Amino acid sequence: MKRQKRIALVNDITGFGRCSVTVELPLISAMKIQACPLPTAILSVHTGFPNHYLDDYTARMEPYIKSWEVNGLAFDGICTGFLGSAEQIAIVLDFIHRFKGAETRVMVDPVMGDYGKLYPSYTQEMCDKMRRLLGVADLVTPNLTEACQLLDIPYPEDGIVTDGVLQQMAEALAARGPQQVVITGLHEGDFIKNFLYDAGHMAIVRAPKIGGDRSGSGDAFAAIVAASLINGEGLEEAVQKAASFISRCLQYALELDLPWNYGLPFEEYLTELH
């Protein structure tokens, strides 16, 4: 009997600011896949606002997972986003071991930092545990900062690396577990570049730079790539689809003069995503 595909989303739920699950769920649903949130926290707005309310969900994650297990749920994909503590990473590792079937794809977006710096909440223990998460991943989508941290190598002073170095980094990340690696958000003149490694094959997907940084862009990218892969598309096609969709949203955000922390106005183009 035919069954609709499902992806478990391990991420926070944020009420305003278009990030994490509130971006991932509608995008994945538009691509005809059931999105099933496993919340790590509930926030009123993301931390890019002057004030936010946060309800840490760590203590509730295990009984939540246990209920899924007792009910016999299974997933075609598991996507992980921002994890707020070493304990949460350990819980997610256990969740993957319990729910990763023979055909389940695990996609890890290691949200750790940017522009050469870790986020303030990130500890050395969290970095070590995130490296362990690589060992159970099929796909990992770090930016340059995160790739350097995962490999324990220095971040380049100007944030620029050659394609040869990117290839070495992608191969080194793949050697730790994932067959597929996308090093995201690389600056190259008037373009943003994504460097792809797919079981030995390399490719580059570029998109024009449009505006500045915008909350939730990484979540949107990860969601579209994940859903595309679960739908049977290749990695390069998936990344191109994500980059093109996000470019349209960024352009529309400029037209609306939308503050960066309001995220991507993806709703305008949601019905065109498939």
Task: Give, region by region, the residue ranges found by the protein language model.
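Conserved N-terminal subdomain of the carbohydrate kinase-like
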Residues: K2-V108, M112-P120, T271
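Short, small-residue alpha-helix embedded
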Residues: Q149, G212-L235, V239
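Conserved phosphate/ATP/ADP-binding segment of small-molecule kinases
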Residues: P120-M202
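A non-catalytic, amphipathic alpha-helix used as a structural packing/dimerization or gating element
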Residues: R60-P63, R132, Q168, E237-F245
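Charged C-terminal helix
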Residues: E236-H274
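Short pre-catalytic strand/loop immediately N-terminal to key active-site residues, enriched for Gly-Thr
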Residues: G15, M202-G216
